Swiss-Prot record:
<dbReference type="GO" id="GO:0005829">
    <property type="term" value="C:cytosol"/>
</dbReference>
<feature type="compositionally biased region" description="Low complexity">
    <location>
        <begin position="167"/>
        <end position="180"/>
    </location>
</feature>
<feature type="region of interest" description="Disordered">
    <location>
        <begin position="158"/>
        <end position="185"/>
    </location>
</feature>
<comment type="subunit">
    <text>A C-terminus-derived peptide binds BRI1 in vitro.</text>
</comment>
<dbReference type="GO" id="GO:0005886">
    <property type="term" value="C:plasma membrane"/>
</dbReference>
<feature type="compositionally biased region" description="Low complexity">
    <location>
        <begin position="297"/>
        <end position="310"/>
    </location>
</feature>
<dbReference type="GO" id="GO:0009536">
    <property type="term" value="C:plastid"/>
</dbReference>
<dbReference type="InterPro" id="IPR039620">
    <property type="entry name" value="BKI1/MAKR1/3/4"/>
</dbReference>
<feature type="region of interest" description="Disordered">
    <location>
        <begin position="288"/>
        <end position="310"/>
    </location>
</feature>
<keyword id="KW-0443">Lipid metabolism</keyword>
<feature type="compositionally biased region" description="Low complexity">
    <location>
        <begin position="12"/>
        <end position="29"/>
    </location>
</feature>
<protein>
    <recommendedName>
        <fullName>Probable membrane-associated kinase regulator 1</fullName>
    </recommendedName>
</protein>
<feature type="region of interest" description="Disordered">
    <location>
        <begin position="206"/>
        <end position="230"/>
    </location>
</feature>
<keyword id="KW-1070">Brassinosteroid signaling pathway</keyword>
<dbReference type="GO" id="GO:0006629">
    <property type="term" value="P:lipid metabolic process"/>
</dbReference>
<dbReference type="GO" id="GO:0019210">
    <property type="term" value="F:kinase inhibitor activity"/>
</dbReference>
<feature type="region of interest" description="Disordered">
    <location>
        <begin position="1"/>
        <end position="29"/>
    </location>
</feature>
Length: 341
């Protein structure tokens, strides 16, 4: 018998050329846990609400949205939705528990805390939540801020300004709002009082000046009118006095000036002197030369005096009527000015 050569100890065993044995060498096992699969998938109701995308971070807003949607439906639907809310809450808790392992290896996937999570996308859900759950703001804060601005113009104390700004910023709460409004109203009253204290003395100084100006104007007008009336009388007395009779019994001279007026034909027209306005008896009768005739003059001038006397009387009456009219008008003006004062 032939002896077979010994086999090496480290030689691998002979493999059969079967497809099963070759495929078994490249097999590998994949284990999938159901919790991790559920964490990667979310239903569409949790991502969209009324056609708008909700914030991607998990928050209690989902339960609020579902409660709002369930309030509009019937009671049967509310019961089913409450059960779904409970299941979704349990699912959220399981997802949060399962996500702790992944966040340890990937810190960037860790969601920020709920206090600072705000989606950059505008959402109607956030507006609804603000409308339902936020207290209404007091509108008096804007008025208080304007009053603090107005008072800061007159006040220079930095402490008071800081106090007003802090009070205006703290009016978000309803309890602090009425107290701040009262403070602003009190500061506005103080500002108005200070303004009136500064303005009153100026007004009191100006008002007597105006009244004194009016009084001086009225008194000056009265004095001017009195001087006009007195001037006529004084002129007449002065002009009546210097009528002097010459030693030879000739003509008397009056200081009324040259009243001669030469016309183209060479004739002269005489007018009455100023003394005739008040005392026509002392003025005498005018001649053609403008000189009055004394009583002791010659008889040849008597015929001329008779012819001129009628015209002079008419002039005197007309002048006296004009003087009376002027006096009446001046008196009326004085009365009107006194009534206006």
């Amino acid at each position: 018998m032939r002896r077979q050569p010994p086999r090496p100890r480290n030689s691998p065993p002979q493999s059969h050329s079967s497809p099963s044995s070759s495929s078994s060498e490249f097999e590998f096992n994949i284990s999938i846990s159901p919790r991790k699969a559920s964490s990667s998938l979310c239903p569409a109701d949790e991502l969209f609400y009324k056609g708008q995308l909700l914030p991607l971070q998990l928050s209690p807003r989902l339960s609020l949205v579902r409660t709002l949607g369930s309030s509009t439906s019937s009671s049967d639907y509310t019961s089913s939705s409450s059960s779904s809310v409970a299941t979704s809450a349990a699912r959220d808790s399981t997802e949060s528990n399962s996500s702790t392992d992944s966040t340890a290896s990937f810190p960037l996937l860790h969601p920020p805390p709920l206090d600072c999570c705000d989606s950059s996308r505008p959402s109607s859900v956030t507006d609804d939540e603000d409308f339902f759950f936020k207290p209404p703001k007091n509108k008096s804060s804007s008025g208080g801020f304007s009053l603090s601005r107005f008072s800061s113009v007159f006040k220079k104390d930095p402490k008071t300004n800081l106090h007003h700004h802090s009070s205006s910023s703290s009016t978000a709460t309803t309890a602090a709002a009425p107290s701040s409004v009262k403070r602003m109203s009190s500061t506005a009253k103080e500002v108005i009082r200070k303004y009136m204290k500064k303005v009153k003395p100026l007004y009191e100084k100006l008002s007597p000046k105006q009244s004194s100006n009016i009084k001086t104007e009225s008194s000056s007008s009265l004095k001017d009118s009195g001087n006009n009336i007195r001037g006529t009388t004084t002129v007449t007395t002065v002009t009546a006095a210097p009528t002097v009779v010459s030693s030879g019994g000739g003509l008397s001279i009056s200081f009324s000036g040259n009243l001669m007026k030469y016309t183209k034909r060479g004739r002269c027209a005489a007018s009455c002197p100023s003394s005739m306005r008040s005392s026509p008896n002392h003025s005498g009768v005018l001649t053609r030369g403008g000189f009055p005739v004394h009583q002791g003059s010659c008889s040849s001038s008597s015929s001329n005096n008779n012819s001129v006397s009628s015209s002079m009387e008419e002039l005197q009456s007309a002048i006296q009527g004009a003087i009376a009219h002027c006096k009446n008008s001046m008196l009326q003006k004085n009365l009107v000015s006194s009534l206006e004062i």
